[in-house]
Structure formats: C-alpha cells, structure tokens
C-alpha cells in the first residue's frame, strides 16, 4: 500500500541505499548525478548511514554495509516457515543432490529465504534475500496458484509480467491457465522461464486454514531433469518435503 504522506528524506536515503546495492561502490559525485541530488545532501545521507553501520567508506567510495545482513537475518529467523522448513530444505538438497530453495511472497514479489546445495548442485544467481517475479519461477507459481484471483490481479497490475526468457509467461490468460494446472497437480514447474537451461519443480506450503505460507523447490539443469522426472519421483519428493513442513507448522 502506498503511503499517503511519504517522508521525502527517508525516500532519498533509501534511494541511495538501493543505488549502492545495484551499482556497487560509488562516490558522492556519481551518486548525486545518478539520483539528481545535491552533493552536500548525498554526503549527509551517506555519513548518517555510515555512522549507524549501514554504509561503509572505502577511500572516496561508499558501499552497503553488513548491518543490512544483520537486519535481514533477524527478519528471516523470526519467520516460523523458515524455522520449520530449514531442515527439510537441507534434506531435500542432500537427497536429490541438487539445489533446494525456500521462497515466500512479500509485496507481490518472491523473496528467497534460503537455499541448500546437494553434491551435484549448480551454482545459480540466487541468494537469501533476492527478490524475483513470481510468474517466472516454479516457486512463485506454486504460491500464485494458492492466492485469490483478485490478489493475483493486483500483483500483475503492480509488477507486470516481465519476460526473463523466451519461455516466460507473458499474458494474464496464459498465467491463469498455468495456475489452474498447478492447482490440479499440486505442484508447479519452471522450464527455463527465469534462467534458460534450468528446470525447477516446487510445491506450496500452506497453513491449516489453506493460507499459502511459501514454497519449496528443487532446481537442476534441464540435461539432468527429464520430462519423466518432472512427473514421477521428483514431485513426490518435493511434495513430501512440503507436507512435512506443513505438519510441523500446523500441528
């Protein structure tokens, strides 16, 4: 929900943080130019952030500090779905030898809470805290399929249907057709829709009242995951992991 009376000073501080996050270490002059702010104002924001450990200074450049990791770690640790799912995600990775993930929805985006690597897992661009469009991942589609249609429409309106690869879902009609299939099967598939050459299978994690709390998945190169795998032992293992998490949360 948009704030009725946003605080401009706070918005400018956050814009600086996000610019540093996207670009990496930057100096005052570069940041001022990129954000159309005065150099004095940029310097004041940065030194305040530095004072509290959120920004560090290396020479003439500033970079995001690890204080944000402390804040994010605290937020993640306080979430019951993370506490309960963590051992299952690790077990899923060990059993399959692949990459296992846990994702939740926040403000219409998917947020990776954790990942665990099996012996043969590929090293992807995902990390705890990474945000991604829900419609491009099996994890996200598992969540979307269990949200009210009106909520899905809100997410589309806010974030659109960005094409990450040629296989990404690009229309509302296509998305809702896919989500119907997810509900029928009980799990979602991503066949190169966020990263080409990668296949992913995910199952939702739901509360006793049916509220979707997140999703758990396994990701692997397409060369190691056949069509038969996507409809055989792999969904059984992922669904089993999701079921264990649900039982531990609900009972």
Curated annotation (Swiss-Prot):
Q: How is loss of this gene reflected in the phenotype of the organism?
A: Deletion mutant loses its ability to grow on both D-xylose and L-arabinose.
Instruction: Work out whether the entry's keyword set contains Transferase.
Output: no
Q: Does Ribosomal protein show up as a keyword for this record?
A: no
Q: Which keywords label this protein?
A: Activator, DNA-binding, Plasmid, Repressor, Transcription, Transcription regulation
- Report domain IclR-ED positions: 81-251
**InterPro entries named in the record:** ArsR-like_HTH, GAF-like_dom_sf, HTH_MetabolicPath_Reg, Tscrpt_reg_IclR_C, Tscrpt_reg_IclR_N, WH-like_DNA-bd_sf, WH_DNA-bd_sf
Residue ranges that the Swiss-Prot or TrEMBL entry lists as coiled coil: none
Residue stretches making up the HTH iclR-type domain: 7-66
| An MF annotation (GO) of this entry | DNA-binding transcription factor activity
Q: Which Pfam families match?
A: HTH_IclR, IclR_C
Note the DNA-binding span(s) on this chain: 28-47
> What biological-process terms (Gene Ontology) are attached?
negative regulation of DNA-templated transcription
Task: Summarize the subunit comment.
Answer: Homodimer.
- Its biological purpose: Essential for D-xylose and L-arabinose catabolism. Activates the expression of genes involved in D-xylose and L-arabinose degradation (xacABCDEF) and represses its own synthesis. Also up-regulates the expression of the genes encoding the ABC transporter complex XacGHIJK.
Q: What is this protein called?
A: HTH-type transcriptional regulator XacR
Q: Which gene encodes it?
A: xacR
